[in-house]
Amino acid sequence: MAQTFTGRKRIRKFFGKIKEVAEMPNLIEVQKASYDQFLQIEEPKGGRADDGLQAVFKSVFPISDFSGAAMLEFVRYEFEPPKYDVDECRQRGMTFAAPLKVTLRLIVFDVDPDTGAKSVKDIKEQDVYTGDIPLMTMNGTFIVNGTERVIVSQMHRSPGVFFDHDKGKTHSSGKLLFAARIIPYRGSWLDIEFDAKDIVYARIDRRRKIPVTSLLFALGLDSEEILNTFYEKILYTRAKDGWRMPFDPKRMKGYKAVADLIDADTGEVVVEAGKKLTVRAARQLVEKGLKALKISDDEMVGQYIGEDIVNVHTGEIYAEAGEEITEKVLKTLGDAGFDEIPVLDIDHINTGAYIRNTLSADKNSSREEALFDIYRVMRPGEPPTLDSAQAMFHSLFFDAERYDLSAVGRVKMNMRLDLDAEDTVRILRREDILAVIKTLVELRDGKGEIDDIDHLGNRRVRSVGELMENQYRVGLLRMERAIKERMSSVDIDTVMPQDLINAKPVAAAVREFFGSSQLSQFMDQTNPLSEITHKRRLSALGPGGLTRERAGFEVRDVHPTHYGRICPIETPEGPNIGLINSLATFARVNKYGFIEAPYRRVVDGRVTDEVVYLSAMEEGKYYVAQANVPLDTDGRFQEDLVICRHAGDVLVVSPDRVDFMDVSPKQLVSVAAALIPFLENDDANRALMGSNMQRQAVPLVRSQAPLVGTGMEAVVARDSGAAIAARRAGVIDQVDATRIVIRATGETDPSKSGVDIYRLMKFQRSNQSTCINQRPLVRVGDVVKKGDIIADGPSTELGELALGRNVLVAFMPWNGYNYEDSILLSENIVKEDVFTSIHIEEFEAMARDTKLGPEEITRDIPNVSEEALKNLDEAGIVYIGAEVRAGDILVGKITPKGESPMTPEEKLLRAIFGEKAADVRDTSLRLPPGTTGTIVEVRVFNRHGVDKDERALAIEREEIERLAKDRDDEQAILDRNVYGRLSEMLVGKVAIAGPKAFKKDTEITKDALGEYPRSQWWLFAVADDALMSELEAIRAQYDESKKRLEQRFLDKVEKLQRGDELPPGVMKMVKVFVAVKRKIQPGDKMAGRHGNKGVVSRIVPVEDMPFLEDGTNVDIVLNPLGVPSRMNVGQILETHLGWACAGLGRQVAAAVDAYYGSKDQQVLRNALVKVYGPDDIEVLDEKQITELGENLRKGVPMATPVFDGAHEADIEEHLEKAGLNPSGQSTLFDGRTGEPFDRKVTVGYIYMLKLHHLVDDKIHARSIGPYSLVTQQPLGGKAQFGGQRFGEMEVWALEAYGAAYTLQEMLTVKSDDVAGRTKVYEAIVRGEDTFESGIPESFNVLVKEMRSLGLNVELLNSKTGRQTNPGTRENLPAAE
């Protein structure tokens, strides 16, 4: 593999044997591609494609007014640059969005009142602002009101036609009732269904059903056409004693003769009664010369007439089409002299009489009646007229504005019904409806299969772009109504397009979608993996999708078509299981929204490297082999039979029948599951937990990439955007903790800058309060290629995902401290900050303008000691770096108090002695209970026009200095590049002119140039015209770049100095960020990658932990009983391989030390070649070899890809290479006694994660606090500073125990006895220990409720006999 900048610093030994031909697509492609297609920001030469935003505008415009005198047309749209960049939006709480400018054309017509002819009177074109459209950041997220959000893709039922049956559940007989449903992208649903009597009905939009023939009448067919469409006809002719029926062998399939079949010509019996006739036998009869059968009059009875039989002369109808033949009808026809009767070909075996029966049951017989009937169903209570009924029926399915099948729907419909309509025909056609009814009737006759709605060919993905498109269309349609009304109410000749447009409804629709749609979610930003998974999530919930309650087992289950498209492992546990899925690693979404998986094409039994993406529908036609089928060097299958998948089944076929082969074994799992080594040895349930828990791993202070990985770590780190990759190749010019400056070395476009400045995020807060901190990996002078990782982010190390730490584990019980999955840790882990993480909490204080005057942020707070103000600066805001504890003031703030009415004396004194300070109360922002930490950042926002305080000005100065430094650095590199080129071009040339004091016609030398300031070098002129024009070009470009740099700087400074847009009524806002360091402690949840989770039960002193023969203490002790029943053996194999990694690391470390001693590098090279083989090592130089060796001291990292990883033999081989026992077990000694344990113990390195369920966030205590308003009981929950609920079962426990006083206390003074709790407080203050409890407030609430029902309840005092009135809070003190 070609080594990257970070890749050669630490090479992973790779166990995979299958070569991967397909490149893994970018992991957040789903989001980016979809939204780019929606926006189409750059307008190409020939105009934009009819997609996304363009399609929405095209579908809504042109808009005409009601009279047709004016028309508003859409010309094009363009985006202006966004007002704030991503970082500014994050800090100021803004939405990262670009203003959308639409060019509209208003055409006014002159309408001739007599002829109605139109002529153009006036055309006006104008750019109109139509709101902001949120833009996607580089990482596939949106910033809405300062928070990062993700729009999750939705899985929904694809538009098209579906055939299904009720599985016999509707009718008691268990008969299968078939139904078809045409689902459009938008518009009315059409259902066509059978009932138990085999009559076919249609429903529109799930309303009352009507016979399907009424629908056909409304489409313009008459009874005869309907019958001709669905049935063949047979012509019976009169013979001398009966009728003659043409013999057709095709109709005889499965026919059983009831009576003898007699040849009409010869009179012979060809088939005896009771015999079955096969198609083959029937063919033989034809070959023997059988042309027609003889049918008696009795057999004619019960057949159906095929067309109206009419007297040609009088027009009298003897029999109608579809009428049943009776003896009476036969006699009438015979008397009238008809000797030929067309009969419908209905044999009740291959063809049923369903449509004919429906026709005879239908009370409507003409188009008008049918239309009226449909109108009554759709709009009950309105009297129908023919015009309104016709218009309504047309608008249901045949009006492109109301009904849209979408391209997908049309394609699916064509495929299912074998039609060939263009995919631009987005409305229903008559032939579509007829084809659906035909297919449904054939299903009832036993031909064909019903559809599987969980097949991924029938479910499609709606990504961001499409969801946004639908939402925007809703907004535009709202706007369209307003425009139409406004066009008719204004003087159309004088208005401009801008006067007609009100962008509010569109902006509101967009804001509503991003702010409150079920699919717009707060991004899970715990670590880079959780971000990527969130962006690749597929949800079946949301608007237009399923609901949890209605979703059955089938929808949630794994389907064969999920293979390579949706991960069968990663899904949440709980009520959403199976409804929320993850995209598989190699999957992508095609233009129709179906998920495609990649396959290698197989030609004549030889596997080629051509990669083809197939959707689930296409894949069903082919035979697909697995990725791990053994191949020879030529790419042919080694075995005679190959296991394949075909149409959802697994078969064994010969190699020449194979069409495709999987590209990679990991293509069937998602990103999170592909990060689990030895996934193939884990039970699926535990793998599910493992992939879900990796997403909850907290970024640690010192991340460490896993020793045993899968090779996916680098991919995730790169694609998630956590680690920074170089945008262009170049040389590192400057680097410090906050930024990296790279001088681009490739050919740069003159209009672009030759300098890349990367700002690193330092201690920023993520959505989940974890810490985002980036660290540079490069030094000045390093050469990087495009795409190389130059800085690590949270949970990444050397460009690889690092969610946890490698720790030395022993699998053994230890004094019961690892009972029930508990975890025992060594004190060493705490001491060395192995599992320490930093969490950043954000607090904000706002100074508002109140009715009584403005609030003020100040250090001058009444009744607060100087001690409490020690961390505040003169503006009343806490210093950066201050250590704060619960209850400390972060921002001092005072609020004016309402004046109490003054007595005359007070007024007099006030008048004599002047104003005393108005009353204010302390409303400072204090640190809530349970947090301690360090202030890492403070941001001050001022409203426009409010004077900035010292602190705000200081922050602003700092920011401007930073911007100026960026500008100066970029300028310096630009100068260096330009003047370097200038000097190269001028030196050695003869100057014909130059700066002052330069002699003409002398050669320019380096020294000569050095005598003049660089700005004067431009004054040199030489005789070579070509050179001079090149110099001019360079100068123009240089000046342009310089101007652009300065302008960018000034823009940013202007933005900084401008006031901030704050919520209404807020004058000033201060945000304070507190970093909290959380060491691991008992109660924290930890987990491995195999679903092996547990809670830390105890942290044991190092000297008591078990130790190895060389004295090394183990870090963590896990219970071996957690493995067998859970069947996640992967963790044991990982432990063994990790042990081998560490052993090899020790050997490399010894070789590095030997090299330092002897300076002979061959020792080190040999040690590395022993581990990796020669290919990777030969290309490295001495410095790189040493760096690699140093990085491998702790262990040689390995990659064991999913389903293609290390086997037991490989692990044993590596254990032996490392000089360790191949069993992977070691003798352990008890740290407390120093004696060896009886048996050898499995010891090795396992990768453990600390999860985001920290005991510090859960532990909580309250003495007094807020109470609920009505019941006066304490609130619940940590967030409300609530109490613990003493519930029904707890009451039973105290009752059973007989603890009467405790129980009374629980139900009164500790809960809602308002007077009682005050008395208790007073008693405690006085030091007494007697108190009485009174009436609980909830009892008063009960009494009040009974009174509201008209039942008066009074309490009588037993001593005095007078009533004590419940339900009033007399002379009670105010609640706390």
From Swiss-Prot:
Residues 1357-1368 have a biased composition (Polar residues). It comes from Azorhizobium caulinodans (strain ATCC 43989 / DSM 5975 / JCM 20966 / LMG 6465 / NBRC 14845 / NCIMB 13405 / ORS 571). Keywords: DNA-directed RNA polymerase, Nucleotidyltransferase, Transcription, Transferase. Its EC number is 2.7.7.6. This is DNA-directed RNA polymerase subunit beta. The keyword Transcription applies. GO terms for cellular component: DNA-directed RNA polymerase complex. GO terms for molecular function: DNA binding; DNA-directed RNA polymerase activity; ribonucleoside binding. GO terms for biological process: DNA-templated transcription. The RNAP catalytic core consists of 2 alpha, 1 beta, 1 beta' and 1 omega subunit. When a sigma factor is associated with the core the holoenzyme is formed, which can initiate transcription. DNA-dependent RNA polymerase catalyzes the transcription of DNA into RNA using the four ribonucleoside triphosphates as substrates. It is an enzyme of class 2 (transferase). Disulfide bonds: none annotated.
